[in-house]
Structures are given as C-alpha cells and as structure tokens.
C-alpha cells in the first residue's frame, strides 16, 4: 500500500532540491528524517516536512505502521517561474528567473496485495 504527500510551489530551484532528494530516496522513513535533520541545505527541512506528511497520511488513511515505511519515490518537478528584471549598465536590464519546485513523496510499506 502506498501513501502520498505533495508540496507545491516551493521557492527553490528544482536542481538544488534534487541534490537533497537523492540522499533519501529508497531509505526507511525514520532513517531519511535522521539524515535530513543534520543537512545544512534550505531544502532539507521542507523535504522532511513532506516525508512527515506522507507518513501521517499512511498512518491515518491506510493504518500502515510508521516503522515499516520506506521512501519509495521522491520526485522534484519544476513549478512556475517568476520573471524579474535586474537593472544593468547603460539602461539595459537582464532577466532573472526565480524558479520554484513541486515535491512529491510516496511512501510504501513493502506489502504485496
């Protein structure tokens, strides 16, 4: 059985968030939260929040044991991009792209139906 949680429009580049997501993919939920607790990245607490939400969804909706859960899938997709301009010399302007991410976490207890 699987449970899912999604965080949308997280204001950080997907490229940077994927670096943290790759560290916890396939790990036990408690082990993944332990790893994220000590990472110095801005994305780590947000990914931990989504994993905790997926864990709570599994417990509440499907009565799955939280100790047996594994991070089966963690996807980081591109969200909307905010376009801003930075003034430059001689009246020019450069476009700045402020990227955002959608983080999807699927946890599984490994049980086959």
Swiss-Prot record:
CDD domains: Ribosomal_L22. This protein binds specifically to 23S rRNA; its binding is stimulated by other ribosomal proteins, e.g. L4, L17, and L20. It is important during the early stages of 50S assembly. It makes multiple contacts with different domains of the 23S rRNA in the assembled 50S subunit and ribosome. It holds the Pfam family Ribosomal_L22. Part of the 50S ribosomal subunit. Belongs to the universal ribosomal protein uL22 family. This is Large ribosomal subunit protein uL22. HAMAP family: Ribosomal_uL22_B.
């Amino acid at each position: 059985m699987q449970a899912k949680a999604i965080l949308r429009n997280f204001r950080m580049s997907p490229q940077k968030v994927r670096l943290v997501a790759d560290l916890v993919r396939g790990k036990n939920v408690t082990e993944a939260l332990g790893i994220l607790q000590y990472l110095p990245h801005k994305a780590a607490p947000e990914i931990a929040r989504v994993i905790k939400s997926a864990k709570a969804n599994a417990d509440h909706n499907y009565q799955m044991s939280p100790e047996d859960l594994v991070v089966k899938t963690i996807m980081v997709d591109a969200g909307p991009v905010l376009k801003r301009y930075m003034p430059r010399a001689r009246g020019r302007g450069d476009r700045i792209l402020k990227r955002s991410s959608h983080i999807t976490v699927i946890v599984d207890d490994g049980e086959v139906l």
